[in-house]
Swiss-Prot record:
Pathway: Carbohydrate degradation; glycolysis; pyruvate from D-glyceraldehyde 3-phosphate: step 3/5. It is found in: Cytoplasm. CDD domains: iPGM (cd16010). It catalyses: (2R)-2-phosphoglycerate = (2R)-3-phosphoglycerate. It comes from the Eukaryota. Its EC number is 5.4.2.12. The active site is at residue 81. It is an enzyme of class 5 (isomerase). It comes from Mesembryanthemum crystallinum (Common ice plant). This is 2,3-bisphosphoglycerate-independent phosphoglycerate mutase. One of its GO terms (cellular component) is cytoplasm. Mn(2+) 1 binds at residues 430, 434, 501.
Length: 559
């Protein structure tokens, strides 16, 4: 259809009224799995979510939140908050980060793009630096993509390459870092055999070095900057394998929190600081934990920490991490073009919207929900509230996080009568689940359940509707499992804790006094996923969804 014919106007739903206040609650990292001692959601007291489950199959069901249902390449790809909120907000399935990069590398298109040609101008005389998470976790990055980019860059004239690694232990097992570093060292040795000066220059654990997000703790980025750009770190080693093995021997060491190190030559000099004229690529395809480093690498005006030096480099991201900020300005692979999101449609149809979370997930209910777009669609129709997250501690120390404060903001917004949709993300089960602390995660799940109750109580008072769902699994299975599904043990006979997301489906529940009698979940979409939620919510606001949206999960039957 030509652009002249396009209209934001949504058709009225034939059976569902407008004007009901709707609460949209996303429980982060809350999947559905069998009941056992490692299912923190099962172990926790969660009376509200338990009572919603009694509404199955008409008012409660499971939906898919991983793999192809959210645009990821395979059914073995765990969902994550970014792609989950994209799907929830967009109402359609878009090829996502990892998939886009795979396609660009497979076809070789990545090497023809503006981004690669821009960094290539440094190859002849300077160094190519690659910075990113080293694992095959597939949430932020993947080792095989780094391997292909190394090979492709060397074939296209890169003579000197330095890799700045960040160890994982969050999306993959703790302790797996050594194997990944050994694999990479082997690849770099093969490049050296072909005359390319290629080596690892620095490293550190992802949660302590570089990969902070939402400006929670700039010291994390500074530690990375000092090692990567300045070539300075508290630990110096002759090679990265020795570095990771040695640093892991500290009593409480783990891959996520390894301290920063630099690799030095025989004379003790760092082998790969970033200097004027060099090219830099940040390898991660997921945006949230690269944005802060991207700002430090790109912004002339920068006051978050003392950079000491601000080298004149050619910098490109694997993808553009923030479309609104145009950050970074250059990138190797174009992001998914997400347009006509449900949020934009709804404000154009008079739905006044309130969105709230705490810092660690605020971007998810706003930026990612709105198709990777910062800011408001219509400022007079929308209000976004960010509650500052605790900083300087790991989330298992305060597992209740800001669930109560988020619920209070949502309650006040619902009772104010100023909003038609009140949307929140409750981060507890995900953020605390990532710490691997089972007891704390149980506390986190209970806190999230209490927050849901407060929001539902407010909806009851105003005669509204609630939709409760999640973006992916995490807290429902905290143990690594063998092929038979039994808890896996390490060599000392201890249970191997799982800190990552899962492949489990997530619940969705609907209800509230404003729900029209006869509304129930359809039984003809058994493989429904997160992308089906947008049309469902549009229906509950009294509108038909656009024809190209994934179909609604609900129907209205006459009693």
């Amino acid at each position: 259809m030509g652009s002249t014919e396009f209209s934001w106007k949504l058709a009225d739903h034939p059976k569902l009224p407008k004007g009901k206040t709707l609460a949209m609650v996303v429980l982060d990292g809350w999947g559905e799995a069998s009941a056992n001692q490692y299912n923190c959601i099962h172990v926790a007291e969660t009376p509200t979510m338990d009572s919603l489950k009694q509404g199955a199959p008409e008012k409660w069901r499971l939906i898919r939140a991983h793999g192809k249902a959210v645009g990821l390449p395979t059914e073995d790809d765990m969902g994550n908050s970014e792609v989950g909120h994209n799907a929830l907000g967009a109402g359609r399935i878009y090829a996502q980060g990892a998939k886009l990069v795979d396609l660009a590398l497979e076809s070789g298109k990545i090497y023809d793009g503006e981004g690669f040609n821009y960094i290539k101008e440094s190859f002849e005389t300077n160094t190519l630096h690659l910075i990113g998470l080293l694992s095959d976790g597939g949430v932020h990055s993947r080792l095989d993509q780094l391997q292909l980019l190394l090979k492709g860059s060397a074939e296209r004239g890169a003579k000197r390459i330095r890799v700045h690694i960040l160890t994982d232990g969050r999306d993959v097992l703790d302790g797996s870092s050594v194997g990944f570093v050994e694999t990479l060292e082997n690849d770099l040795a093969q490049l050296r055999a072909k005359g390319v000066d290629a080596q690892i220059a620095s490293g550190g654990g992802r949660m302590y070095v570089t990969m902070d997000r939402y400006e929670n703790d700039w010291s994390v980025v500074k530690r990375g900057w000092d090692a990567q750009v300045l070539g300075e770190a508290p630990y110096k080693f002759k090679n990265a394998v020795e570095a990771v093995k040695t640093l892991r021997q500290e009593p409480k060491a783990n891959d996520q929190y390894l301290p920063p190190f630099v690799v030095v030559d025989e004379s003790g000099k760092a082998v790969g600081p970033i200097v004027d004229g060099d090219a830099v690529v940040t390898l991660n395809f997921r945006a949230d934990r690269m944005v802060m480093l991207a700002k430090a690498l790109e912004y002339e005006d920068f006051d978050k920490f003392d950079r000491v030096r601000f080298p004149k480099i050619r910098y490109a991201g694997m993808l553009q991490y923030d479309g609104e900020l145009k950050l970074p300005n250059r990138y190797l692979v174009s992001p998914p073009e997400i347009e006509r999101t449900s949020g934009e449609y709804l404000v154009h149809n008079g739905v006044r919207t309130f969105a709230c979370s705490e810092t660690v997930k605020f971007g998810h209910v706003t930026f990612f929900w709105n198709g990777n777009r910062s800011g408001y669609f219509k400022p007079e129709m929308e209000e976004y509230v960010e509650i500052p997250s605790d900083s300087g501690i790991t989330f298992n120390v305060q597992p209740k996080m800001k669930a109560l404060e988020i619920a209070e903001k949502a309650r006040d917004a619902i009772l104010s009568g100023k909003f038609d949709q009140v949307r929140v993300n409750l981060p507890n089960s995900d953020m605390v689940g990532h710490t691997g602390d089972i007891e704390a995660t149980v506390v986190a799940c209970k806190a999230a359940d209490e927050a849901v109750k407060m929001i539902i109580d407010a909806i009851e008072q105003v005669g509204g509707i609630y939709v409760i769902t999640a973006d992916h699994g995490n807290a429902e299975d905290m143990v690594k499992r063998d092929k038979k599904g039994q808890p896996a043990m390490d060599k000392n006979g201890n249970i191997q804790i799982l800190t990552s997301h899962t492949l489990e489906p997530v619940p969705i529940a609907i209800g509230g006094p404003g729900l029209t009698p006869g509304v129930r979940f359809r039984n003809d979409i058994p493989t429904g996923g997160l992308a089906n939620v947008a049309a469902t919510v549009m229906n509950l606001h009294g509108f038909e969804a656009p024809s190209d949206y994934e179909p609604t999960l609900i129907e209205v039957v006459s009693n």
